[in-house]
Amino acid sequence: IFEEITNAARISKNGGGVGVNVSRIRATGSWVMGKENASGGVIPWIKLLNDTAIAVNQGGRRAGAVTVGLDIWHLDVPEFLEMQAENGDRRRKAYDVFPQLIIVDEFMRRVEAKAKWTLVDPYEVKQQLGIELAEQWGDGFAAAYETIEAELDKKIKLYKQVDARELFKHIMRSQVETGMPYLAFKDTINRANPNKHEGYIPGVNLCVAPETLILTDRGHLPIIELANKTANVWNGSEWSEVFIRQTGTNQKLLKINFSNG
């Protein structure tokens, strides 16, 4: 984990934005070195990334930009959703990162069906069942998740079942109150991934930089060359003719202070 934080610092130092998925980290109350209820969960590690973003700015131009993703099945999701709220323990807050929640289709199906959703600890799932849940998506995730739920109160002891629709409402309340998290739909992203041979996509980054390569019918081109032009872009399943609009150049950074702090 510390190695990844160091990598994030190096990227930020050179002006890059950083996207990190923390879904493999043990949940709060998990085992550490054989001791039960020893893990502090994902929040302390997110706080380290938060402080790294502040300490290591983007070449002196602006504060570091870090987005932190957590999969919707992780036991720490409820606390993750409160991570930027004004109330609660300030020691478990991280206000300078951009949280993203990684959503799978199975969760949305359960929201629609008003069904239960099970939050689990990735460490216990891997130790007891040999399943690296963070790597699963689509039908593979649905099958793995079914296996996990069949082992509740057997091999899987650390879990919590919630109403899927209530959890989705919690997400929306958090978005209204804080503007975050933004949502990354993992199955949709990976179905549209033209480079599946390189592996799966665990989450998304913050934005598109000028040198980002875009697949067009003329090959991969830096998006800056396509600014304010029409191009045929591959959307994952077909070519789409789109107008690529540059939204701004050397935009000023504004700081807004509210009366309530």
What is the role of each PLM region?
Residues I1-C207:
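Active-site cavity-forming subdomains of large catalytic enzyme subunits
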Residues V208-G261:
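HINT superfamily self-processing domains
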